[in-house]
Design a protein with these regions (language model features):
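Conserved core of the sugar-phosphate nucleotidyltransferase
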Residues: 123-214, 240
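Short active-site oxyanion
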Residues: 60-65, 87, 140, 219-220
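Residue-level signal for inorganic ion chemistry
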Residues: 23, 48, 103, 117-118, ...
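Short phosphate-binding loop-to-helix
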Residues: 81-114
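N-terminal glycine-rich phosphate-binding loop and ensuing alpha1 helix
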Residues: 10-71
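Acidic helix N-cap motif at the loop->helix transition within catalytic regions
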Residues: 73-79
């Protein structure tokens, strides 16, 4: 524990580009069976509060923009009023790319790095935020990943067409952190070309940019189903 505290103090003294966080919580959660996952309680607090708190308490995040649905603007603003890093709460778009772009537009121009994070990943740790931001400071683009445990099959028409080498596969998490100008340009290009984008790394990869992968955290799960929400309650109890 002492080593962790000392390491954190040393890292705080190292100069970093200013980094703002865009927390995307604008989806409709069609797999949640009618549960609004933004407001879904985990240990009696809405999920979005847990997520925002992690970035509020991070030493490497200067500013936070939350992107959500129109009807949640006021409730989210009220819930996050005690977090002084929250710069704005804005309305998302029709898809993830539009929502991320809305968040980028709301960030201050002096944020040279941007960390894009899923609002439905409430168990993000300061360690993962820290090492991803620092990697992006060095490489321009970075994301956390964890090794894939299951065997992955390429399936077409219900038939297996191939089995990728599992040792080369990683499940990519968020926050995904980029040079702000790079991400803005990559998303603009993807939008103009109507390119399918599954995450922000995909947009940057299309520009020929390499993304540095850092160690993620298996606890950094994305809440996408009611079962995930039950698992989240168990994970939260473990930390109490």
């Amino acid at each position: 524990m002492k080593v962790t505290k000392v390491t954190r103090q040393i890292r705080k003294m190292l100069p970093l580009k200013s980094c703002g966080a865009v927390i995307v919580a604008a989806g409709n959660a069609t797999r949640m069976g009618g549960i609004d996952k933004v407001m879904a309680p985990i240990d009696r607090e809405p999920m979005i509060v847990h997520t925002v708190r992690a970035f509020q308490e991070s030493d490497v995040i200067r500013q936070i923009v939350i992107v959500t649905r129109q009807e949640l603007i006021v409730p989210v603003m009220d819930l996050c009023s005690g977090f002084d890093k929250v710069h704005a709460v804005v309305v998302g778009g029709s898809d993830r790319v539009e929502s991320v772009c809305a968040g980028l537009q709301a960030l201050s121009n002096d944020m040279k790095l941007v960390a894009v994070h899923d609002g439905a990943r409430p168990f993000i740790s300061w360690q993962v935020i820290d090492r991803t931001v620092r990697a992006a400071h060095t490489y321009g683009a970075a994301a956390p990943g964890v090794p894939v445990k299951d065997t992955i099959k390429i399936v077409q028409g219900g038939v297996v067409r191939g089995t990728p080498d599992r040792s080369t596969l990683q499940a990519i998490q968020t926050p995904q952190v980029f040079d702000a100008a790079l991400l803005k340009g990559a998303l603009k290009k993807a939008t103009l070309e109507n390119a399918p984008i599954t995450d922000d790394c995909s947009a940057v990869e299309r520009m020929g940019m390499s993304v540095k992968i850092v160690e993620g955290d298996e606890r950094n799960i994305k809440i996408a189903t009611p079962l995930d929400l039950q698992l989240a309650e168990l994970l939260k109890k473990e930390t109490l």
